[in-house]
Amino acid sequence: MEADYYSPEHSDADDGGATPVQDERDSASDDEGNEREQRSEPGSPERQSEDEHSDIEDNKHRSDSGSDNEEGAEHNDSEDEHRPHNSSDLENHDASDSENEESRNHIASDSEDDVRRQKGSDSEGSPVKDAASDSDEEPIRHSASDSEDDGPRKEQANDSEDERHKKNTASDSEDEAPAKHQGSDSEDEAPAKHVASDSEDEAPAKRAASDSEDEAPAKRAASDSEDEAPAKRAASDSEDEAPAKRAASDSEDEAPAKRAASDSEDEAPPKRAASDSEDEAPPKRAASDSEDEAPPKRAASDSEDEAPAKRKVSSSEDEAPSKQAFSASKKSSKKSSGDSEDKARGKRAIIDSDDEDEDVPVKRAASDSEEETHPKGKASDSEDEAPSKQQPSDSEEETPAKAAANNSEDEFPRMKRKIVSSDDSDDEIDRKPLQKKKKKSPRRSSESDSSDKVDSKKRKASESDEEEEKASKKKSAILSDSEDEDAANKSGNKKSRILSDGDDSDSDAGSDRPKQKKKLASSDSEEEDELKSKTEAKNADKLFGSESDSGNEEENLIADIFGESGDEEEEEFTGFNQEDLEGEKTVTSANKQHAAAADSDSDDDDVKPGKMGDFKSDFEIMLERKKSMSGKRRRNRDGGTFISDADDVVNAMIMKMNEAAEEDRNLNSSKKPALKKLTLLPTVVMHLKKQDLKETFIDSGVMSAIKEWLTPLPDRSLPALKIREELLKILQELPSVSQETLKHSGIGRAVMYLYKHPKESRPNKDIAGKLINEWSRPIFGLTSNYKGMTREEREQRDLEQMPQRRRMSSSGGQTPRRDLEKVLTGEEKALRPGDPGFCARARVPLPSNKDYVVRPKWNVEMESARYQGSSKKGVSRLDKQMRKFVDIKKKNRFGHAVKISIEGNKMPL
């Protein structure tokens, strides 16, 4: 059978039949002929026909005539590709439409069942699959039925091109024309009725439902090249959509490319030739023309959608058309199950007549993109692609919408649709009920509503599992191509518009529904989401706090203690190392938790009254009293505790300090010398340096008094230098001060002021910086900064912090300490049994209470090392030469074998 298609005579006839079509249509076909020749060279059926000769003339003539149609279609398509989008495109698309219809009529007259199944299943793939045994004869019949009046059909195609071009130009050239085609039932409903009445239900309905002229024409094009090429080129020359993708695929749907490559010997054979006799190898055609397999399988069942999806992902045919075919295959699978095909056509005819005039012209009017989707609609005459994509009338149009988006019908129309979708957002709500009504009316006009509803319910029920797989595969098919991702993103508005039809929103896009519903109700849902997010954020902040809060707390605390950072800009505090500051925030939360834990531990003694209410037991009152008294308890040097008797002295001292500061302020404001603080300073320093009173001073509020002494006078002059020096030293010697004390006393602000003051002395500034560093490190959760300390400072700090061990008293049953020297010298006799303090056992040595803080002195004399170093430096050349000489001698000694005397001479025995 391949020899029939690929015979040399057949190829010659094809070449002869194609040239008049080129002459009739345009002179631009020269370039296209060259392109065709170039395409035909690699795997053209002509070469194959030369290799594979056959003598069957009937098939040859049929294939010749069929190829004439296909070459005409190729020329039309190639002309469509190269021509500017003008009336010639319309003619070509119309020609493809008319040729589709005429070929359908011829097919209906010749072998409506077989050939239309072939066409319906895209005549390249489905003949192979619907009539695998007659796969060669039926396509031949099909091409014969088309080729019987091939020349006439071309003439009719040209005439119909003129007529439809007139119709198209009369009716917005492609919007109204397909709408009329579809609305007049002559092109849509008539074929659809033929489909319904004849076995064409599978084929044309599949064409119609399966985007017949992206899918079916893509394969009809194989058999009716004029259908396929215009269809795909209407679809592919849908001017941006597929050309971009088909240009990317280097062969408008592998089928047009193969057609062009084979000079349209039969665009079915070209595909067959390209796919190595796709009739013989239908799986290859299925692989290459996933749309061929898809329609027959769609006719067979709905589960094939999964396979078409995969095929379409794998097939390089038009990533977009393959997905259109895929989405269309869902249509076809759903619509081929019953008369819903006719209903879909009726719907699409009416809906397209209305909505294409509404949506499509609006979306496509600004450019030739009218032809893009419309050529698709026209190419399929059933206008399943464009209508289904343009109109959410069918529940499947969710998928076509995705197919339209995936096909990126045209990137420009897409953009226009985006814009129009926003512009027509007011009309969307009106259109949707209209479209729903239109959906219902065509269903009623074509057949009863219940058939579609029952079918759709059955589909939903039967395909509920398949649809999930479809959705996943759809997503994989869609997301596999970046163009499709862009298309899907760009068609978001369109999807939202399409999916707003609650009646028709099948589970095809079940996973996308919530997103698209959110898009439709974006104005409400976004506000709700914002409110929710705000409330959640507030709740989270209340429950857990936030980093900004913690940072603000630290900043506020620092501001409370040391004042605002912007008060004086003369000198900034640079006490912290960078690595310390980097770790601040991470440590603060932990430290706060530790502080909270410490507070809770310290409060363990007190039963928290907040939990128990205001009721306090006698025990709690007693604990409170005890706690209030504990502030006055101090540790003595020997570890004993005592209640300070110096509280009255401390309080009197603080009173005097405050009075002196107040008097100095008054004197300064009255322009008199303020000497009260200076006269009192020696007494204050004397008391503040008493180690046992320091904590008492701090508890009694000496920090606020020191702050009064360090603050500038009313005339902004600093207190006396001696006062500043002495008090800063005392502050440095005071034990650690709590944050609360620092905060309430205001000492931090006074010290910071001195630190930043330009007239403060450098030693005082250094002390002030150290104080600020020491006080602020606990706030940021930092430990002592040992890096900033010198060795002496570290040693001094260790000595100061060395714990004062309680010395074991020699009273009680403990062994009195004896002086070992006296025992050894005999001055003190060793204890004997019966003596007090005697132990009749070996005594365990007492643990050492020594903290080895001070490093022991190095007892080794360093002079020897120094001498060696100096001697090394002072080595003379003579010594070096002598050493070398000695080394050479040593080497030479062992340079030769040791001679052993057999007689035993010279043996060191």
Swiss-Prot record:
Ranges for domain TFIIS N-terminal: 704-782
Compartments where located: Nucleus
Signal peptide from the UniProt entry: none
Residue stretches of biased makeup (Basic and acidic residues): 47-65, 72-122, 138-165, 177-301, 360-381, 444-455, 531-541, 789-800
Region spans: 2 X approximate repeats: 451-530
Biased composition (Basic residues): 434-443
One GO location term (cellular component): nucleus
Pfam families: Med26 (PF08711)
Keywords annotated in UniProt: mRNA processing, mRNA splicing, mRNA transport, Nucleus, Repeat, Transcription, Transcription regulation, Transport
Region ranges (Disordered): 1-615, 786-820
Coiled-coil segments on the chain, per record: none
Any single biological process term in GO: RNA splicing
Presence of keyword Ion transport: no
Superkingdom field: Eukaryota
Sequence repeats: 451-470, 511-530
Function: Transcription factor which plays a key role in defining the composition of the RNA polymerase II (RNAPII) elongation complex and in modulating the production of mature mRNA transcripts.
Entry-linked PANTHER family: PROTEIN IWS1 HOMOLOG (PTHR46010:SF1)
Family: Belongs to the IWS1 family.
Name this protein carries in UniProt: Protein IWS1 homolog
Lineage: Eukaryota, Metazoa, Chordata, Craniata, Vertebrata
